[in-house]
């Protein structure tokens, strides 16, 4: 009886694993807050380099930074260079394809926030 119930549930898709999130290559609108709480905006371009890694470039105002990124389940992380400093941002991949995260820079106190929305 248990086998019949399990088969019935499987056929209905109730025991199927949840779909993994994905991040698409392309251009994203950027909205964020700096370490001091001030806001910034711009664009970010993600280019896939393998099934799990990518490169990312942010352009916010007169600032451009580049980094390497990776996707793991619904977490998307990027390490980047900003001037002479190294930074890290960790995003949560949302069901609508947007990315919501928090970032920091080496040697600085606090963290900023950032949302990337696909264009």
Which role does the model predict for each range below?
Residues 1-4:
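Positively charged n-region of N-terminal signal peptides that target proteins for export
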Residues 6-7, 118:
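Short amphipathic alpha-helical "recognition" segments used for binding
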Residues 7-13:
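Bacterial N-terminal signal peptides
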